[in-house]
A protein has these predicted regions:
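Signal-transmission linkers at sensory-effector interfaces
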Residues: 11-59
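Helix-loop-beta substructure at the N-terminus of cytosolic sensory domains
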Residues: 62-101
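Acidic/proline- and glycine-rich, intrinsically disordered low-complexity segments
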Residues: 101-133
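Signal-transducing coupling segments at domain and membrane junctions
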Residues: 125-149
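A short, aliphatic-rich beta-strand micro-motif
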Residues: 148-157
Length: 201
């Protein structure tokens, strides 16, 4: 009788059960996608945290300031997977601006603020992530044409010292973008400041 009744309904009858199942399956697929994205983001965040921690530990291993600078542009850069690291120090003596280190770059007073803000009348953020402006060429030397994105970390080296900046350059234009979080780099910058202050006494 049930079968006969179903046959008499014809093709114009809407199968509510099938529609409900289709909707449930679509919702389940969306939940699965969300779940996968959340797990992937968690793994990426954990990997980034471990990466920064390893870089900090390597940075703190140096027993001399010269070794610290060598490690910074060498193993620390490798751990962070960046293609260039430069420490920019300001000097109030323009006549003494000679750069002999591939890690440290001396610039005139006011350079850090102007570089981070691109000359705009605004306060410089502690962490700035962006595509490399054309003005960045002088910081990266012979690698300038390859660097496509950068992280600018404004560094406070203590009272009575001019501002400084640590820049990390990458050949990947998407490695540093303005919509990314900056918590890990803020932490790295804080440790970096303390380590450099220790060397500077």
């Amino acid at each position: 009788l049930v079968g006969a009744n179903d046959d008499n309904k014809g093709s114009t009858v809407v199968d509510l059960r099938a529609i409900a199942m289709d909707r449930l399956e679509a919702r389940f697929d969306r939940l699965e996608d969300t779940h996968r994205n959340v797990i992937a983001a968690a793994y990426d965040n954990l990997a980034g945290t471990n990466q920064v921690h390893r870089a900090i530990l390597r940075m703190m291993d140096a027993t001399t300031f010269a070794q610290f600078l060598t490690d910074l542009s060498g193993e620390v850069a490798d751990i962070l997977r960046v293609d260039a690291i430069r420490l920019v120090l300001e000097s109030s003596d323009p006549a003494g601006l000679t750069n002999t280190s591939k890690t440290v770059t001396l610039m005139p007073e006011g350079y850090v603020e102007g570089y981070i803000t691109l000359g705009r009348n605004m306060p410089a953020r502690q962490i700035t992530l962006r595509e490399v402006p054309t003005a960045g060429g002088s910081l990266y030397g012979e690698r300038a044409s390859y660097i496509k994105s950068e992280a600018c970390l404004k560094v406070d080296l203590g009272p009575d010292r001019l501002p400084a900046m640590l820049v990390m350059g990458s050949e990947d234009p998407l490695q540093f973008t303005s919509h990314q979080g900056t918590d890990l780099l803020t932490f790295f910058a804080g440790v970096f400041e303390r380590v450099v202050r220790r060397w500077l006494g």
